[in-house]
Amino acid sequence: GTAIIVLAGVLNALKVVGKRLEDVKIVQNGPGAAGTAIIKMLQVAGAKNIVAVDEHGILYPGRPAGLADHKEWLATVTNPEHLTGTLADAVRGADIFIGTSVAGALTTEMAATMAPDAIVFAMANPNPEIMPDAAKAAGVRVIGTGRSDFPNQVNNVLAFPGIFKGALSVRARDINPQMKMAAAKAIAGLIPEDELNEENILPKAFDPRVAPAVADAVAQAARES
């Protein structure tokens, strides 16, 4: 669920800053279940340069600190520039930071080394990897968190129940990547281009348009895939 909302947010944030998904460098901090799903989703959508970082630093094949189970695979499908080092090394020059890690993981100093017009999704709960005011002070253009008291809340409720409704309506046996992509694009598309801005990249959690739009898009994708 989170991966779908993150992709929707990323698509709209990229429009705000005028960059393309296939061109940007993305750092994903905390590649557990949610983080890994986000990486897969972004790659399906066309992201080419994703660097995954865990508590031992950047993931790369044969890392001395070791790679648990799924991270072995992640190391082979991410990090095309073969970076090594820490989170600070990874975020230098990055266009997007996506955190599913711990509070305070992204310092203001690190955020300041990101590329111009940087985008940050800091989703550690209850306290994000970096607070929105600190991110803005560091020059970040767009910041989303998991919290409802800040703009751009990444909330799973945007994906469900629309996805299930759409899948059930066409008796889909599973929810495939095409259906997830369709859901993300439907969510992103609910914000008209002229209303998109740094503080408005995702619909609100209880926007009544969300579930029907997602259900329709998912059903359509299920029929086509």
Which sequence ranges carry the predicted segments?
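Short, glycine/charged-enriched secondary-structure capping and boundary segments
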Residues: M41-V44, A65-A68, A111-T113, A134-A138, ...
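Terminal amphipathic helices with adjacent charged low-complexity linkers/tails
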Residues: A52, G57-Y60, V214, Q220-S225
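Flexible loop/turn segments at secondary-structure boundaries
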Residues: T2-I4, G35-T36, I58-P61, G104-T108, ...
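Adenosine-phosphate binding glycine-rich loop
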Residues: G1-T2, L11-V17, D23, A122-R223
